[in-house]
Amino acid sequence: NRSMESTCLLADHRRMVERGNVLLDYLRGAETAVVEFTTGDICEFDLRFRQAGADNGYLHADKQGEAFINLPSGEVWIVPYEGEIPGEKSRTEGVIPVYGDDGQIARFVVNENRVVKVEGEDQLTIDLREELALDPARRNVGEIAFGYNEAAVVSGLFIEDEKAGFHWGYGRSEFLGGTVGPESFRHPDTVLHRDLPYAKDCPITVSVALRYPSGKVCLLYTSPSPRDAIPS
């Protein structure tokens, strides 16, 4: 999309590496991410037994791991704990609002890292219920992520919107470090990973606090975008 040539693709990738490292430091050792939406809904994401990853635009010869990046770049992600350890349930629970293009809002009720119910009375709610009913694996909370590309704007193009602030995703997660892969789904046709953005200028935005095992709480940001809270 050529519109990104004048926005997120112009970002300083050296700064993105630095700022991504700051976010990774915050997430390292965090036990819970408490996300409060501007609708008043709250969801707590269980971050135990997980490591965050970064898509920071770095693609030099000494890059560790696979030699590719996404464009635009600029996000840090983590897969919430999915309850795969015997006897250790996931603590991810709460309510996540989902907005539609026409202003409708449905609410995902989450328990043990799974969407157990979709609340609402409009067409958006019906559509989301039908989407989840196609395969139980779609109910998995598969990602939370923090976009921090300073040049990204909310344009309706998701690959840019997600780099402008917070988003979360449901369904498949193994490609991000989780445990739910294509084999977890009923059929190849029902495999899904869907991301939903809550960045600055989206109809719903968020505040995020991180809790650590020591009891320490870090307010990651209260503004619509983490780009404003990460030290330069």
Predicted regions and their residues:
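Internal helix-turn-beta structural module
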Residues: 165-168, 173-217
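Conserved, well-structured core segments that form the ligand-binding/active-site neighborhood
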Residues: 1-85
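Short acidic-glycine loop/turn motifs at beta-strand connectors
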Residues: 39-40, 110-115, 119-120, 212-214
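Metallocofactor- and cofactor-centric catalytic cores in central/energy metabolism, strongly enriched
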Residues: 95-107, 112, 117
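Short, hydrophobic/aromatic-rich segments at coil-to-beta transitions
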Residues: 31, 90-97
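Conserved small/polar residues in nucleotide/adenosyl-binding loops
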Residues: 221-227
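Dual-mode signal for accessory low-complexity, basic/Gly-rich regions
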Residues: 91, 117-179
